[in-house]
Amino acid sequence: MDLGDVVEMPMKVTEWQKTYTYDSGINSGINTSVPSLNGKMVIEDDSLAYPNSYTTVKTTTYTQQQNPDMESHLNMTRAQRVRAAMYPETVEDHSYLFSTQIEGQQTNVQKLAEPSQMLKSAIMHLINYQDDAELATRAIPELTKLLNDEDPMVVNKASMIVNQLSKKEASRKALMQSPQIVAAIVRTMQHTSDMDTARCTTSILHNLSHHREGLLSIFKSGGIPALVRMLSSPVESVLFYAITTLHNLLLYQEGAKMAVRLADGLQKMVPLLNKNNPKFLAITTDCLQLLAYGNQESKLIILGNGGPQGLVQIMRNYNYEKLLWTTSRVLKVLSVCPSNKPAIVEAGGMQALGKHLTSNSPRLVQNCLWTLRNLSDVATKQEGLDNVLKILVNQLSSDDVNVLTCATGTLSNLTCNNGRNKTLVTQSNGVESLIHTILRASDKDDIAEPAVCAMRHLTSRHQDAEVAQNSVRLHYGIPAIVKLLNPPYQWPLVKATIGLIRNLALCPANHAPLYDAGVIPRLVQLLVKSHQDAQRHAASGTQQPYTDGVKMEEIVEGCTGALHILARDPVNRMDIYKLNTIPLFVQLLYSPVENIQRVSSGVLCELAQDKEAADTIDAEGASAPLMELLHSRNEGIATYAAAVLFRISEDKNADYRKRVSVELTNAIFRQDPAAWEAAQSMIPLNDPYSDEMENYRAMYPEDIPLEPMGGDMDVEYAMDGYSDHPGRGHYADNHMMA
């Protein structure tokens, strides 16, 4: 645009105004139409009209001469209306401001004025911010002096003023940057006996604690011991400010956890669990979790102050989700402490946690599941868990790996040596659910192993054990179970599977399916491998190490015991014999492990029923070790040895049979005439199967905090940067991320 155009613009605008004065909603409050040349227009030409229809449109245009009063009024108010839209506070009479405004809508002038209003507002905020900052900066030295005054009234007034300043951003920043006034606030809070002053000073620290700079200032000024002292205040508002400030410090200030512990903060916090404000309790329990995580001493302090009882009480009595979640996290941390576990269980923790397994909150359900999982190995004798067991069986249909891990592990432990729980789970379709779980997660040891352990328990020593044994077969579980013996070997899973197969073999109807699934060659292969490993360590004179927590001798015992029960079936017995196992079984008679002596003599007792096998046993030189075992203190071993000797001596000469008869009489029947009967039953006397005596491991890690004060903060709980980190294996909680 050149200079000539700029000069001509006012002239063009004036000309336009003279001819189209009333055609704009900006200049007029009346509705207008397109002007015509003669003031009216009638469509009469057929060529311009639609066929068979006629329309008449009237348009009226006023000139300046026709309505001079209106023109004068509009010219007078134009500038005022723009000014009123831009700066409404300068106008006294607002009556004409809405002449063009339809109700609920802005005029064009008002829309155009919005940026200027926003700019004006920003300028005002900036002026106020600067004023607040300057005021606070000038006032801080005097306020510091007043806070240190000896007159309680002066101190009270000063604390009230500082409290007001701490509520505004600019003045709050100035306060945080003054170590002198923060120290004065802490000192005043610690020594005042006036409740109002205590409320004001704790409120100030609470306001400062929302900023990293404020947290550091409080920490350096010795604020933590003072805040811990305020936890004994009878004033609810003081308690709330103190606990929330400590919570922020624990979350985001390095060194705060140690400072709270040294100030006996835990001893002050645990009694606060008796309060009845759910939101206050949620913050308190989260503080306990932050302090207890990875610190055994803190866990013991919580125990010593009645923490487990208070936490269980909260889980039992409240419905506030955030409180239940934070409380369950504390219990989860404590549930891996050997001292706290029994206390939680005795306080009714299993029942209280089970109450929330059907909650709509996934994070609460998962915490409860992990805690139940960790506690379950010391809760095998607990009563009142029927509903929990049924829910856990239902949870086996979940697709969540964590849920399945917890549900299977808890069921495994709660069914260990507890006949009532075994029967209840069996009657609740537990066997079928566990089989489906194994089919879906056979490649996940964290799930498959406890699931197999639970099935091992369900198939032994309770009134519905036979029902469970048959149920495995009827739900096509045998092939899936036998496949778990395939390489690569996960020894804890292999050990549990061998024990389950032994129990399944107690049911004669399962022998054929087990045979068809190829269980005998797999067991023999495992037996040979594990025995060779055990012999290798014995030859080198080194103590046999555990492989994933399992000794090879345990695999030897398990495989031999399972083959012992399978050998009751003639077809299986012949298959075992054909795999050239007798030399190995005879060698196992020399084992120093009593349980291996028992199962090896037991399987030889079964094999000796066949003449060919009995001759092979004799040819392998079994008589000598069997004669020694006749004098074993274990009646089961002595009984099996006697039975084998009796069977292999049937074809011997009279002198040999007489000598064996004397040995048998002296060793067996002198003590118990029923021993021979026991040999036929193949159940060792007073010696429960060892796998049944073991609880499934209950060691799982606690939560691992994320980096504090970062972008990883949990969106569901703004002041808490945590994510759950469940895992398997032995618990190692002493590695916190600072």
Curated annotation (Swiss-Prot):
GO-annotated biological processes: canonical Wnt signaling pathway; cell-cell adhesion; positive regulation of transcription by RNA polymerase II
ARM repeat ranges, renumbered to this chain: 128-167, 168-211, 212-251, 254-293, 294-337, 338-377, 379-416, 419-460, 466-506, 508-547, 570-609, 611-657
GO molecular function, one term: protein phosphatase binding
Keyword Membrane on entry: yes
Primary location group: other
Pfam family, one: Arm
InterPro entries tied to this protein: ARM-like (IPR011989), ARM-type_fold (IPR016024), Armadillo (IPR000225), Beta-catenin (IPR013284)
UniProt membrane topology term: Peripheral membrane protein
CDD domains, per database record: CTNNAbd_CTNNG (cd21725)
Alphabetical UniProt keywords: Cell adhesion, Cell junction, Cytoplasm, Cytoskeleton, Membrane, Repeat
Subcellular location: Cell junction, Adherens junction; Cell junction, Desmosome; Cytoplasm, Cytoskeleton; Membrane
CC terms in the record's Gene Ontology section: adherens junction; catenin complex; cytoplasm; cytoskeleton; desmosome; nucleus
Similarity comment: family membership: Belongs to the beta-catenin family.
Summary of the function given for this chain in its UniProt record: Common junctional plaque protein. The membrane-associated plaques are architectural elements in an important strategic position to influence the arrangement and function of both the cytoskeleton and the cells within the tissue. The presence of plakoglobin in both the desmosomes and in the intermediate junctions suggests that it plays a central role in the structure and function of submembranous plaques.
Quaternary structure, from the entry: Homodimer.
Protein name in UniProt: Junction plakoglobin
Lineage, opening ranks: Eukaryota, Metazoa, Chordata, Craniata, Vertebrata
